[in-house]
Amino acid sequence: MIRFVDANLGRWLRHLLFVLIRSYYALFFNVSCSGKHLLQDQPGTLILATHVSRHDGPLIAALLYSTKRIRPTVHYHEYYNWSQFLPMFIASAIPMSSPKSWPDEKRKARKAVVLKIVHKVLAKGNSVLLFPAGKVRREEREKVPAYLSGVHDILRAEPETPVMLLRLDGLGKFQDAAYDSFWTFLGIKKGRRHVAMDLRPLRDLDPSMAVEAFNARLEDLLNEPISHEL
């Protein structure tokens, strides 16, 4: 029954939600996105993104919605927060973690279930948005702790999975802020904040590496600055 509702009513609600979100962000952010067209011809892609602010998930999902169906991953507690049920349901979000209070065996079983869902989504040709750092950046450099093995586990199980790196600039607390003149007709000098989104294929991640070395390499890639050279 849930699948039937999602396939019919959910499709319309999803489209309406993302149109509203995209319109909202267009009022406050002037976003440029490079490489978005590459995603359209690459089904079943794992998108690894920097996590610079709480706006990342909805902004990315809304901007890429018309290009490819994106299933965002979210924290367990965020997913099961009753106040966020509707957007989580409409966006078909995937809860990636589990409460630390759970026994180890229960957490391992939960992780296996989540990884199975991710692989099923990718096999259907949909893309999965994942933030390797696991939380919003609280310092200038993106950190990918060695104990977060989700990306490593996904690619080790399916090494041929297409991977794309998504970096955001201008949106986070520790990034430079620049504004356009969108609101000057109202006498407001500070307009929309300029945000750069860069999406490119990633072919040099080796899942055969130990998870510590793998995460260190991924961390370096996430922290590479976006080139704005013409």
Annotated model-derived regions:
Residues R3, A7-F29, Q84, M88-S92:
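Short hydrophobic helices that act as membrane-entry/anchoring signals
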Residues I21-S53:
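Helix-to-loop junction immediately C-terminal to a conserved catalytic motif
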Residues D41-R107:
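Catalytic core of membrane glycerolipid acyltransferases/transacylases, capturing the structured
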Residues G44-L46, G125-F131, P162-M164:
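Residue-level preference for the first positions of well-ordered beta-strands
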Residues V52-S53, A133-V136:
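Short glycine-rich anion-binding loops that position phosphate/pyrophosphate groups of nucleotides
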Residues Y76-Y79, G134, R167-G172:
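Short beta-alpha junction loops
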Residues K106-V114:
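Glycine-rich anion/phosphate-binding loops
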Residues R138-E212:
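A cross-family acyltransferase "interaction/gating" segment
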